[in-house]
Amino acid sequence: MEQPMKPTVIITGASSGVGLYGAKALIDKGWHVIMACRNLDKTQKVADELGFPKDSYTIIKLDLGYLDSVRRFVAQFRELGRPLKALVCNAAVYFPLLDEPLWSADDYELSVATNHLGHFLLCNLLLEDLKACPDADKRLIILGTVTANSKELGGKIPIPAPPDLGNFEGFEAGFKKPIAMINNKKFKSGKAYKDSKLCNMLTTRELHRRFHQETGIVFNSLYPGCVADTPLFRNHYSLFRTIFPWFQKNVTKGYVSQELAGERVAMVVADDKFKDSGVHWSWGNRQQAGREAFVQELSEQGSDAQKAQRMWDLSEKLVGLV
């Protein structure tokens, strides 16, 4: 008897950290994972090391900092002929030590280009694929961060600066080099990351508003906890990479392992408990065994309907959708 096709999920940044262990958890649940990554050899190596069954994953190149790469990825995925049941926008870059911005292939500031604009285009292009999937329970999940949400303790820390999108003056002006900040003010690398993640959460809100009722697709964001040893911090001071995990494990008790964070991502993708759309899931930044997820309130900016609509309209122009 022919075996039914495994449900398919795309995970960006699945070669390390939360994305990799989210892929593992979903493979263990019987899913087929499209590992969307920049480095194909590295991705194959970690898939082999974790013992992923060969029929449980497909690796496709994706560089979110290059909009043409996003379009090529979507075309390559469609060649597989697999119905898309879920999309997880996990990949992110963080450059906390930069005094001057890095630029994407499209001449956008690299962290906003990768974390927000690349994912924004990917979500929009793959909406048709999610709609076409015959499964009734389809989900699009974007990872947020505590540092972009002032309703959580980690989001109240003012260093280097809190997220502030202004009125999107930088986006309005075209956001091309030398404009490096969404509000068109002086470049601050850590703030650029926070701004990009705030845009991620606004994107989730606007996806829900525009498409949930029509399509039934579940649109959510989540914060799986403080993964203090994540490769996201690879561009930070080596001393920070040593002290921060120790501090989270022994002082705040907020440390969450990459494995547990990946399991939490898989839960939001696959479990019936997480079928509500338009919410931000959190575990309260704690490792405790059996800790339950809850719907976390977002900041005023992250809950601002007008800001979400303006972000959407300007982002559509920046990625060439209009």
UniProtKB/Swiss-Prot annotation:
Q: Which GO terms describe its molecular function?
A: protochlorophyllide reductase activity
Recorded hits in SUPFAM superfamilies, A to Z, give:
NAD(P)-binding Rossmann-fold domains (SSF51735)
What are the GO BP annotations of this UniProt entry?
A: chlorophyll biosynthetic process; photosynthesis
Family note:
Belongs to the short-chain dehydrogenases/reductases (SDR) family. POR subfamily.
| Name of the molecule in the record | Light-dependent protochlorophyllide reductase
- Which organism does this record belong to? Synechocystis sp. (strain ATCC 27184 / PCC 6803 / Kazusa)
Tell me the superkingdom of the source: Bacteria
Mind listing the UniProt keywords for this protein, alphabetically? Chlorophyll biosynthesis, NADP, Oxidoreductase, Photosynthesis
Instruction: Write the Enzyme Commission number(s) for this entry.
Output: 1.3.1.33
Q: Does the keyword NADP apply?
A: yes
Q: Which reaction does it catalyse?
A: chlorophyllide a + NADP(+) = protochlorophyllide a + NADPH + H(+)
This protein's pathway reads: Porphyrin-containing compound metabolism; chlorophyll biosynthesis
Q: What does this protein do?
A: Phototransformation of protochlorophyllide (Pchlide) to chlorophyllide (Chlide).
Which Pfam families does the entry mention? Answer: adh_short
Could you tell me which InterPro entries the record lists for this protein? NAD(P)-bd_dom_sf, Prochl_reduct, SDR_fam
